[in-house]
Regions:
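Glycine-rich phosphate-binding loops of nucleotide-dependent enzymes
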Residues: 1-215
């Protein structure tokens, strides 16, 4: 990353796009403490978090999904959510069922995660992130490999999170999803931020067009 600066406000959906290798996942890793930056700072709610471990950052209220699905195939959908909880089991189960209902998977709560479709597994991972009630949610390619019906359920859930006052930052290669969902889009190329703005502005930005298609 080279001098990348992002500022996120509560209750908004942001997109982070760029060609392959532009630094999108690296930026997510820096925010969540998986990778250490050489310079600069990461602040959340006015507090520097760049020196914290990943689990400490998660406890501050930042949740994140990954490009590669990370579910436990031999656990049920419900159990996959319960593995990240602390405290009373009854309260955790109620919260997990509420979240499965949030993405229309309550009826599959007892199904082994390994038997679910790829898209359903993505939804399980998505709501597992919500079990800790984060206020900033980072989604890494949420639409990849998801059929249209499940994708619509996921996008509706993201909008409802925004309406609850949460902030969502997503990396996504599906430009239709980005342009239809995000209110502000950041564009990276070779580790630098080359553009920032509303989707309509980004679509016509010459620097963005050149980054994707060349001259």
């Amino acid at each position: 990353m080279d001098g990348v600066s992002l500022s996120l406000e509560p209750g908004r959906i942001y997109g982070l796009i760029g060609p392959n290798g532009s630094g999108k996942t690296t930026l997510f890793n820096c925010i969540t403490g998986i990778e250490r930056r050489d310079a600069g700072r990461v602040a959340f709610n006015g507090e520097r978090i760049d020196g914290l471990k990943p689990y400490q950052i998660a406890l501050k209220g930042i949740g994140r999904t990954f490009q590669v699905i990370r579910v436990f195939p031999e656990l049920s959908a419900l159990e996959n959510l319960l593995v990240v909880t602390r405290g009373g089991l009854a309260e955790a189960q109620a919260r997990a069922l509420e979240l499965l209902r949030f993405v229309k998977l309550e009826g599959l709560r007892n199904e082994y995660a390994g038997n679910l479709s790829y898209g359903q597994q993505k939804l399980v991972e998505f709501v597992r992130v919500l079990m800790r009630d984060p206020t900033l949610i980072l989604l890494d390619e949420p639409a990849a490999g998801v059929n249209r019906t499940l994708l619509n359920d996921l996008l509706d859930a993201v909008r409802r999170l925004r309406d609850q006052g949460r902030t969502v930052l997503l990396v996504e290669h599906d430009m239709k999803v980005v342009m239809g969902l995000c209110e502000t889009v950041f564009v990276l190329d070779h580790g630098e931020k080359i553009a920032e703005g509303e989707p309509g502005v980004i679509q016509t930005d010459e620097r963005v067009i050149e980054a994707y298609f060349g001259r």
